[in-house]
Structure formats: C-alpha cells, structure tokens
Amino acid sequence: MTLVEVKDDKLEIKPVRLRKEKYKAQLENKIFNEDELYLFHEGRNYNAYNFMGAHFTSENRKRGVRFTLWAPRAKNIFLVGDFSNWETKEENKLNRINETGLWSIFIPRLKEGIKYKYYIEQEDGKAVLKADPYGIYSEVRPNTASILCEKTKIRWSDKKWLNKREATNYFESPINIYELHLGSWKRKDEDEFLSYDELSVVLPKYVKEMGYTHVEFMPLNEHPLDASWGYQVTGYYSVTSRYGDIKGLKRLINALHKNDIGVILDWVPGHFCKDEQGLYMFDGTPTYEYEEKWKADNKGWGTFNFDLGKPEVKSFLISNAFYFINEFHIDGLRVDAVSNMLYLNYGRNHGEWIPNIYGGNENLEAIQFIKELNEAIKTYSKGVITIAEESTSWPNVTNDTEYGGLGFDFKWNMGWMNDTLEYNELDPIYRKYHHNKLTFPMMYNHSEKFILPISHDEVVHGKKSLIDKMQGDYWNKFSNLRAYMAYMYGHPGKKLMFMGCEFGQFIEWREYEELEWKLIDKFDMHRKTHNFFKDLNNFYKNNSELWELDYDGDGFQWIDADNNEQSIYIFIRKSKNIEKYKIFVCNFTPMVYYDFNIGVPEKGVYREIFNTDKKEYGGSGQVIKGNLFSRKGWCHNQPYTLTIKVPPMAVSVFERIIEENKTEEKIVKEDKYI
C-alpha cells in the first residue's frame, strides 16, 4: 500500500509507515531482525536476499534450512519437494510471521541439492506450485524447481580490479563493450553449451586480445525459453543453470577481472515472465505485478509489468541488483526497456491506459523507483555503473537525481544508431541527400552521457547482420563496415558492439547455434576484418583524445560538416592536453581524392596514424606513409592547410607530431606522402 503526497510542488510516493512494534511479538523467537523487516516493508531493504528465500542455518542446535516467503494474500503455504515426495505435510506448513504477508519455516536435516517449491493455497480454494522468488539456483529447463544451495563463496582474486574500479572516473576513461550471449558465442557442439568454467578459460583471453574494456552479458537470470534470450525471467536471483553453477559464474567474472575486463549484466526490472512457476499471480492475486489489469499486462511482450510502487517489490528488485553487485562483483547494470517503465502508454493504444494524477503519461512510481535504484548504487557501490536502454527523448536520463535526473551513468544513443545505420544502408550515390544523418547526432550529443550501441537487436528478425546492412558488392560491404566503425570510434560517446560483428558474420545472430568462427580461417576478408577490429579497439584504448572529453564540448570540433557532395566528414577529437588531438577524415563514397585540402588548426608536421583502407584490412592500400607539412592559408575556417590523399570508402586519422632535435623543414625533406 502506498500514499501519494505533494510536497513543494513535487510528487512523492511514500510507503505507509509500518510501526516496528507491530513485528516484535511475531518474530519467531527473534529469528528475524525487526529493522530488516521494517525496511523490507518500506521498500528500503537493499539486502533482502540475506533473509528472504532459503538459508542454511542452525536453530535450537539443529542444522537445517530457514525458508521465508512474501505472499500477502495466501491462505496457507506448504514447502514441498523431493524430500517430501512432493506431498503437502503439516510439519512443512509455513507460519505467517506478520500481518503484511511474510511466511517462514525452519526444516532440519535438509541437504544441498534438494529440489523444492512452495505449494500456495489461495483464498478461492485453488492451489499453485511456485519456485522460490529469492531462490539462488534452479533446475535446468524445462524443469522449474528451485534447488537448495549453500551460499557459494569462491576464492576471489580481483581486489586490485575492485580498487581500480572504485578510483576510476568512467566518464573520462575508455569504455568499449563487447556484448555477448553466452549460449551462442561458442559451443562444444551443436547442442551443448560451454559451461561458465569452460568460458572462463577462453573468453577473458579473447576479449583482452581484441582490446575491449568490458563485456556485457545478456541476461543470466533463470528463464524458461531460450528464444527469449533471457529477457523473460522467472528466477531473478537464480543464475541460469544452462551454463553451470553459481561458483562457475563467479570464477568467470573473477577471470575477466584478472584480465582487466569489466563485467556488465543486462538486467530486466520492468517486467517478468507469465509462466506459472514464476512471479505471475504469486499468491493467487496480483502480488509482484500491478493490481490494475491494464497496467500489469504487457501485451507487446506477453509479460507482466512489476508494480514499482509496492514497497516489497522495490525491496525485491533493488536487493536483486545488489545481490549481483555484492555476491558476483559485477561492475555495471544495463537496465533493459526503461521506456516501458517510464511511460504509462508505452505500447498501448488510445483508450488502453489511464493518465497519472496530473493527467500525464508518466509512470510516477517507476520514476521514483529508478531514482532510488541509482541513488542506492551510487551510495553503497561506488564505481558500479548503470546504463539505461531508453529509446525516447525523455530528458535528464543521465543527470543526477538531485538535479531532477533519473541518475543513470550512461544512456544508449538509439537515435545515433538508427540514423547512422540508415545512412550506411544507402547507396553512396544517394548519401549526399542524407548528409545530416551523420551530423545531426552532434546537435544533441551533450544532452546525455551516451553510449553508441550496435547491439543484438540490430542483427535479428530480418534486419540483416551488420556487414550485410552495408551497401554495395562484397568488397564495398567490408570497406563500408570499416569506415562506419572508425567513424563510430571517433564520434564522442562510449562504444558497444555485439559479438560476431567483429569478423563480419553475414548471417543474422541465431541464439541456437554458435557464431560462424570458421569464417576467420576460411576467408581472407573475414580474417582481415577481425584483425582490423583488434587494431581499431586498441587504437581507441591507447589514444585519450577518443574518450577523455566524450562529455565535454571541448572534446569535439567540426572542421567540415557540410561537404555533402562528396560525402566527406572531417572533425577533430581532443584531450585535456591541448597539444594532443586527432583529425578524422571520413569518406563514405568509393572515390579516391588526390591533393585534397583540409583545414588544420596549427602549423606543423602531420602524420597519418590510422587508415581503414590498408591492404592488411582488405582495403585498396591508398595510405600515406610519410610526413605532411601544413602551410599557411585558410581552409575550412582553419588558419593552416594540409594536402592529403583521401582513400575510398574509408576513414583516415591524422595527428600533429613533434620530433626532438629536428626542425619541421628537415622532417619534410626526409618524408613525403605517397
């Protein structure tokens, strides 16, 4: 139950304050801490997993398991499992421990590995079997029981990483995320997944060699359907058993940290799966979902939306975030489908939704939940980042909550992604008519702290793979991909790339089979593309101009944004060191331009330091090997001019160099571009 109050013209949703005294006589011989329960029912217990669910413990000198469940409108609840032949027995009946819906029981002599569920009798006389909402391990699908599991500790060896994480300013650091689906990255054979432990041997090495800074795992919470990719969750605290056990996942994360790779987890706090064993109508009535059917039912995805105003649901979800932060050492959460949470009319037609108390379409409870989530993580887990997948123009997503923002650290730039993909799908002949597709994103670039995403959503459902989206014949597709990627890495904002794009897989991603790694060995262009991505990733990571001032207006400057006739874009990326900058020349047509003049800000010697048209990458080899000397003369509103060669469908990057004990004239005499 909640109260809505208006204070200082701001809406505040506050839980009804529950008097602590209410619990004191009902705490089963003081097994439960009254403050924990109080905070749980206030929506402010962020470690509820420490007492909810199943916990091995000793009571009255007996070793066993304490089970605790929230089911406020259940009539009776029994624990059933293979220990009881799945029969309800009076000695396994849970006790109601307070009038707000908590139930609990201690059962001695239970062992790890026992399968169990809750048999919940509803007020209407019907009964249903439910998995434990706080259960930390489950049967492999299609089976659905929870499995008793001791708190699984491993010997962590990532202290150095965690200390570094806490001290890092991620806004001024390189972030280059490799998004992957563990079940289809690599497999043993057609039908067998690699386990967490097997992945810990190969994945960290691969990601480090490729030059990525982070991985982002698609959801690893337990889910019944492989084809949902993990986004329709039944067990929020249960790490999916498809790939092994809890310790295995911890060892995988530990191995990634030891290789200086951060771990971001895709997380779905907005809606949940309708399967009977899950949270849906948990006690026979709307429990985790909204009471109002229109508000609960997510018709677009066939799921139910969480009631983000219920205190116990808030405790459940925010505790779930901290469960993975504290127990698994994850470094960030990518929050899925934030738009679905923010808008009452998201995915609904006119007449299918009811406005909020102010007449608007904003979900006020969800806004408050998101703010509390981000505030809690910033307060208690310094260095852990949160990322919003938010597809609308909702303002201040990455602004601090104290200034009216939602409090996320980063937001996916879906507008940039849509515009740039549309541009690169065009025949180069027509690109001059759509020149603003690549310039417009800079108009709003500093409104949020953006991540530029090329995610799994862009390479499925008939959208084509990334390489196949590119226009032209075989050669041009690869050259266009390289140019697009170099432009992306030069554009302000952190980076995210989905697995398989890094070697140009032509088929769309399919969750039921591994990536086509064989292409790298069989075909030169795929091997060269793979090497290109490795070089591009490391070029990005090793040059602070490409990330240090991502969110500072001084970090980017157009030299020429208006050359639509030739589809050429020229810009500068800068660092805090005013002497360091990189000049990007991006050509999105298959034309070569010789003796091409560009404006540069300073007199000096320049050198081409990266070129996507290198033969080693599969290009035509139109590169500049020597040094270049700028001459005085205005060009592109810059005081000096540099004459270069512009390679076809490619990006070339230049920097100004200074060599000790050599004059610029001497350098020029020694080197010329070819």
From Swiss-Prot:
Active site as annotated: D336 (nucleophile), E389 (proton donor)
Root EC class: transferase
SMART domains assigned to the protein according to its UniProt record, in alphabetical order: Aamy
Protein family according to the UniProt entry: Belongs to the glycosyl hydrolase 13 family. GlgB subfamily.
Organism per entry: Clostridium perfringens (strain SM101 / Type A)
Reactions mediated catalytically: Transfers a segment of a (1->4)-alpha-D-glucan chain to a primary hydroxy group in a similar glucan chain
Biological role: Catalyzes the formation of the alpha-1,6-glucosidic linkages in glycogen by scission of a 1,4-alpha-linked oligosaccharide from growing alpha-1,4-glucan chains and the subsequent attachment of the oligosaccharide to the alpha-1,6 position.
Pathway membership: Glycan biosynthesis; glycogen biosynthesis
UniProt protein name: 1,4-alpha-glucan branching enzyme GlgB 1
A Pfam family the protein falls into: Alpha-amylase
GO biological process terms held by the UniProt record: glycogen biosynthetic process
EC number: 2.4.1.18
GO cellular component terms given for this protein: cytosol
Molecular function, one GO term: hydrolase activity, hydrolyzing O-glycosyl compounds
Keywords of the record: Carbohydrate metabolism, Glycogen biosynthesis, Glycogen metabolism, Glycosyltransferase, Transferase
Complex formation: Monomer.
Keyword Transferase on entry: yes
Underlying gene: glgB1
